[in-house]
Amino acid sequence: MHIQSLQQSPSFAVELHQAASGRLGQIEARQVATPSEAQQLAQRQDAPKGEGLLARLGAALVRPFVAIMDWLGKLLGSHARTGPQPSQDAQPAVMSSAVVFKQMVLQQALPMTLKGLDKASELATLTPEGLAREHSRLASGDGALRSLSTALAGIRAGSQVEESRIQAGRLLERSIGGIALQQWGTTGGAASQLVLDASPELRREITDQLHQVMSEVALLRQAVESEVSRVSADKALADGLVKRFGADAEKYLGRQPGGIHSDAEVMALGLYTGIHYADLNRALRQGQELDAGQKLIDQGMSAAFEKSGQAEQVVKTFRGTRGGDAFNAVEEGKVGHDDGYLSTSLNPGVARSFGQGTISTVFGRSGIDVSGISNYKNEKEILYNKETDMRVLLSASDEQGVTRRVLEEAALGEQSGHSQGLLDALDLASKPERSGEVQEQDVRLRMRGLDLA
């Protein structure tokens, strides 16, 4: 089982190579391209009996990322590789994506960046004399400057938190004596020459700038520590989901490449949209104790909603139920909530297919679009968190006895809802009246086009 927890920039390997380029002691180090013939010869091997093309491709894809992992671990002082290893019997759906392998490596690399920041701590008290005397040591091997630039590159590529990635990138580009910080992590370049030629005043200015950088690094470190802690908890949850649901959970991995949600969250959302939504919601709505599997799904979904931000604009979705729902007893203008998760759809046709008792039009901003994870992509599902407060703007029965309801997420406030004419802006087509037909339904349904049927 391979768990992806972080979504990263594809330039990670390049950045790490750049962080390590320069000189090794007195020897200049450069990248030398390996001849293609040698590469082919090195990669040639007899495939074990029964090993198919997909498995061999998977092993080839993961090899460079494992090599990066080894290199980074040695640089930052970690001698034991605990990262995921390619499995002989891994499922092709999981093992065939280079993106997944990269994310697995970055997941393991992020904790290592904390060790790099530890090694850089001496920069906070570095003196101008120490800079002149120790620059070669600081900028090579596991020296403070080298470790800092490498750790920041790892955070920029490996953090799942956008603010941390941005801050790490800004620090790498910070001008130290007129030279970007990331260039101070090598010897033999412009930074080395500057230290040799600098006046005592300029060296003091450089160390003052490094002191300021380290004060900002301390704040960044706190954010990374918090993220690493969350990653550890997420891995435990992901392992629990896989242990409980097996392949039914694993099949959802990789369904949200580049998304904000972790493996555990994606698996939990996927399992919910599959066959587990009914039992989980029934237990939540009836106040029953959740079983072990339901607790895992609920935990993962709750984490997903905590991480998700609100949409920039109000989203209109539709919901249908075969009977009543949690808002039956809520009067117009009042606020209520569903104790379970609230599934809605961007497609009104989906609401009609479910709606033999109640059809609702829902306006909100906090829903999660799970269509990319769900097996039923045509449902275009937007999922709201359990106990999301909704204000009932309209509730009336049509001539078929179906309750038509308009819900507005209560958190939107007065300026986003009915006071701005939201009801009148509904664009759902209503059926034309036939001559002589008695209209029993609430006149507001016809005026505002709320007839979905």
From Swiss-Prot:
The keyword Secreted applies. PROSITE patterns: BACT_RHOGAP, TR_MART. Residues 96-229 form the Bacterial Rho-GAP domain. GO terms for cellular component: extracellular region. Its EC number is 2.4.2.31. Bifunctional effector protein that is secreted and delivered by the type III secretion system into eukaryotic target cells. ADP-ribosylates several eukaryotic proteins including ezrin/radixin/moesin (ERM), cyclophilin A and several members of the Ras superfamily. Host Ras ADP-ribosylation blocks its activation by its guanine nucleotide exchange factor, thereby interfering with Ras-mediated signal transduction. This is Secreted exoenzyme S. It comes from Pseudomonas aeruginosa (strain ATCC 15692 / DSM 22644 / CIP 104116 / JCM 14847 / LMG 12228 / 1C / PRS 101 / PAO1).
